[in-house]
Amino acid sequence: MPRDVDVVLKGHSLEGRKVLLGISGGIAAVETVRLARELRRHGAEIHVIMTRAATEVISPLAVRWATQANVDVEWDGDMAQLDGYDGLLVAPATRNTLAKHVNGVMDSPLVMAMSAATGNGTPVMVVPSMHNDLFDDAVTQDLLKEVAVRGAKVLVSPSEEGRRKQPDPVSIVAEFAHHLNRTLNHRNVLVLLGGTESSIDDVRVVTNRSTGHTGFAICDGLHRLGHRVTILAGRTSFDVDDSRFKVIYSPDAASMKCWAKDLIENDDLGIDTVISAAAISDHVMKESFSGKLSSDDVLDLQLVPFPKIIDGMVSWLGKKRGSNAGPVVGFKLLSGDDDEALVEAARSQIERSGVSAVVANDISWVQGDGRRALWVTKDEVSELADVESIVVAIDGLLLAQG
């Protein structure tokens, strides 16, 4: 039976990582319990340092319950703030704490930890939270710029109700994981997701039932693991807009092909890897009708095969990136077929398109509770239990060819 303090693991982006969580005395410190548990859901091993002011907002006992870790407030002989950590997250980061750090005032274990992390190159992320008038003050802006110049990531939310509130825990942990995991070996990834459509007339379209959820989960997972992601989205069942990603909407199959080529060839984006998780139409309308067809009309729709977009991606990447081109990963969905047929279809795509790997699944797996997909390469077939497993497999391929 799970204990009250336990959490359910959602991902592995912080697995095995020693994270120092710093809490200063802003009112946003009341969010620490939720933030700490979200860190743990992604595998983080946490140690906590609070300022005295923070203990007036939330008790060390509550923080210890949430983190299942030691909580330091006062100086002690262990000097845990100088231990080796994989990353330092300061949330909330008050102006007072930032000013002390920038100006070398070292009157608390937290400020010492910030200085030590800066000195030894440990990734640092600060999350300021304050009223707009304080945030917009020139002194605050200078402090934030200086913190960023010293290598820290500064995560600021949009203004809401006259305040820069602390972002939600899911967003904070996602950005912190990305900052912690980002290295020179990580890729600039283009992910195609969602369904495509072909116009019947000016109102109606032929489309498919793809929601885009799997593709977006892959984007989220790859971002947390340190990759930079650009999204080319077709038709989805949800709003794909997310400040972490550059998002292009192109539900039309033909325009999606043009956008994919343009994005790969865009020097500013530097795309070197493609994940083609979109359900791109195999057939499109031979010719669309103008206006709106009458509901009394008997329709005889002519559909023609649409060229496979993925067939050009390896070539586009190779021409643009040369030896720096990363892998292309395709997706293959069948219905009612056995594993042998799935593997055969996936390897046919590998041979035809030159992709490095294919995520192959049956539609019943997508809708069921069992295994999620097969990971198929030229020489390997393995089972993937869930979307997180798909992310891990793709990440391993990206880093292996980095």
Predicted regions span which residues?
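A cross-family phosphate/adenosyl-ligand binding-site feature
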Residues: 1-402
